[in-house]
């Protein structure tokens, strides 16, 4: 059982409160301030999109120098970079998808962006690329040939693996939003794709709790499945009020028992003992004032750490006795009492 964890969050988790229905309600924080804030909150790593690190309008010949300045900022703040993720969903060139676009020029641009991301990663000191295929799907099924689309996804993964023999790809799957019908909507789908790549040992998953809930699945079971495969290389912990849009609520604030089970499966299976990081992908409520718009991060970290303590302290012999006697009512109360501090 591992009870010692390192923590990370994305720079996007310190945001302005803008949403699809309203503008920003807080000022934007400069990158350097975001980094120092994360460190002050007790985080060890930062997560970045490619254009968080190096904006897309930076000329190709200046990308490395720009990335070096960001690396110096991270070093000064005392943060390592956990991963970099290519942002393949905002550019108008990817309106019909990036990796699975019908237009071969869009697919080529998506691969160029992945290569640029890897070049940035190498400067920032990480070999971990998180791939969220946000627009890889359809609004109507007839618009794309799904068999060809899966082939494009495999070609894309193989091209990334060939570009840098040290890179590791972490697929982060989600069933919907922004696309109505997503290709590879679940962990299992991506792991099946990973097995078909040219180098399966370098392809794993990052599991986001809210995405599992949107699938109608339990995050703990999804994590367990990836752990069984030896493929759980990252997590995004948060919470979710049911099957709706991706809310990124503070971890454990909706369903504490579900959160406990996610923590417990990580603790019991030594997640973190081999360099894996606990990522918190949570948003401040739009109502939060600017100077309090970081409590969602500290609160989520505290909930995780408290649940680790519950997992470590719970009587495993009593737990096992309830299982062996098939007394699941007794087991349920053991868990509930532990969560209530009774």
Q: Where on the chain are the PLM-derived regions?
A:
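Gly/Pro-rich active-site loop or hairpin
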Residues: 15-35, 144-150, 180-191, 211-277, ...
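Active-site acidic/histidine proton-transfer and metal-coordination neighborhood
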Residues: 75-86, 90-204, 291, 330-337
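Glycine-enriched alpha-helix->loop->beta-strand junction motifs that scaffold or abut catalytic
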Residues: 42, 127, 199-202, 227-233
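N-terminal cationic-hydrophobic initiation segments that often serve targeting/anchoring roles
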Residues: 39, 71, 161-162, 194-198, ...
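Hydrophobic faces of well-ordered beta-strands that scaffold small-molecule active sites
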Residues: 5-14, 46-48, 79-86, 129-131, ...
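N-terminal pre-domain/capping segments
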Residues: 1-122, 200, 298-342
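Short, structurally constrained coil/turn elements
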Residues: 1-3, 75, 163-165, 199, ...
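Active-site-proximal loop/turn and secondary-structure-junction residues that shape catalytic pockets
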Residues: 13-15, 50-52, 85-90, 133-137, ...
